[in-house]
C-alpha cells in the first residue's frame, strides 16, 4: 500500500507542475491578489477531484474512454468551454486592492471552485488513464483493486502539495508586482486560456 501511495504522490506532484491549466491560473490569481487561504482551498478541492480521477483510472476507468470514442469528443468540448469561460473572467477581472479578508465562505467557495473546475475537466480522465497505463506497463507496483485508494490519496496529496507550493512562491513574490502589473498578468493568462482552446 505504501508504494502505491508514494507513487501516486510523486505522479500527482510532478504531473501538476506545468502551469498552463485552469487550476494553476486560479491559484496564481488568488496568490497575486493576496487571497492565500482561498487559493489553498482551490488547490485542495482540485487535488481531491483529480485524486478521484486517478483512483477511478487505477480501477479500470480507462476502458470507458477506450471503448467509447464519443467520450474523448465530449471531453474536449467541455474542456474548451471551461477554459474559454475562465479566460473571459480573467480578461475582465480587476485585482483586489491590498490585503483581503478571507472568511469561512471564501474558503468553502475556493474549495468548491477548485473541485468543480477539476471535476468538470474530463481530459483529466484521459490523462490519468494514460498515466495508469504507463504505470501498469512499468510494473512498479501490482495492480489490484485494493491499491486504488492509496494511489488516489497519494495523487490527491501530491497535486495539492504542488499547488500549495506554487501559491507560497507567488505570495512571496507578489509584493514585486504593481497593481497594473497584476492586471496585465491576469489579462495575459485569460488570453492564454482562450487561445489554448
Name every feature range the model reports, one short phrase each:
Residues 2-73, 130-149:
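Juxtamembrane transmembrane-helix termini in multi-pass membrane transport proteins
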Residues 14-22, 120-124, 163:
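Short helix-coil transition sites and intra-membrane helix breaks within transmembrane domains
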Residues 36-112, 169-173:
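Membrane helix-loop-helix hairpins that form the core translocation module of multi-pass transporters
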Residues 75, 79, 189-192, 196:
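Hydrophobic alpha-helical transmembrane segments of polytopic
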Residues 112-130:
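Selected transmembrane alpha-helices and immediately adjacent juxtamembrane segments
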Residues 144-160:
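Short alpha-helical packing/oligomerization segments
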Residues 167-192:
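Interfacial loop-to-transmembrane junctions
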